[in-house]
Amino acid sequence: MAPISVILVTDHKLPEAMSTTREKLLATTSKFVSTFGSFDVDEILAIRTPTCLYHQCCPSFNKNVVTNEETRANFPQFIATFRRFDFSILEPDHTLVDEASRRVMIRAKASAESIVGAYENEYIFILKMTEDCRLVDEIYEFYDTIRLKDLQHRLEAKHISYGDTAPFETRTTQF
């Protein structure tokens, strides 16, 4: 992994090339975030490369790697579980951008209405972009597992499986 470059800017202006790369990375990140509540799997996948891998990285859950095809196949479960899913960046000023490696890290929150009531969670996402910064090539997701477990328990109480307990195949993520 390339080291993160830091530029000390005293006049509040970034060099032209750095600004353009940074702006592209942030624009793609913004698109990624805006697709979460769209309930449109085509829109969600349009921001990703065809080979994008989605790493769900929480040790107390199975560490899954999900492909675009698996996302598409499992999307009906998401639609059936949530009536509304609002997703946004928390503290945008704390978003980390590594222009050299084309990575962005955000802290985000979800506020949703599920078929078993309210659901809220917080996330850390690390997005690895393509060289031109226009598509997401890899996603690393970390989330509050206690809140997700609570949702799963409420779903299980109604005999509904979701997430790691749902019947779909995934692969284990390697760090």
From Swiss-Prot:
Spans traversing the lipid bilayer: none
Pathway(s) it belongs to: Secondary metabolite biosynthesis; terpenoid biosynthesis
Q: Which residues does UniProt assign to the signal peptide?
A: none
One GO term of the biological process aspect? terpenoid biosynthetic process
Disulphide bonds in the chain: none
State the InterPro entries in the record.
Fungal_Meroterpenoid_Isomerase, NTF2-like_dom_sf
| Taxonomic superkingdom | Eukaryota
In terms of SUPFAM superfamilies, this protein maps to: NTF2-like (SSF54427)
PANTHER family named in the record: AUSTINOID BIOSYNTHESIS CLUSTERS PROTEIN F-RELATED, AUSTINOL SYNTHESIS PROTEIN F-RELATED
Q: How does it assemble?
A: Homodimer.
Q: Misc remark for this entry?
A: In A.calidoustus, the austinoid gene cluster lies on a contiguous DNA region, while clusters from E.nidulans and P.brasilianum are split in their respective genomes. Genetic rearrangements provoked variability among the clusters and E.nidulans produces the least number of austionoid derivatives with the end products austinol and dehydroaustinol, while P.brasilianum can produce until acetoxydehydroaustin, and A.calidoustus produces the highest number of identified derivatives.
> What does the similarity note say?
Belongs to the trt14 isomerase family.
This molecule's function is given as: Part of the gene cluster that mediates the biosynthesis of calidodehydroaustin, a fungal meroterpenoid. The first step of the pathway is the synthesis of 3,5-dimethylorsellinic acid by the polyketide synthase ausA. 3,5-dimethylorsellinic acid is then prenylated by the polyprenyl transferase ausN. Further epoxidation by the FAD-dependent monooxygenase ausM and cyclization by the probable terpene cyclase ausL lead to the formation of protoaustinoid A.
> Protein name, please?
Austinoid biosynthesis cluster protein F
Which organism is this entry from? Aspergillus calidoustus
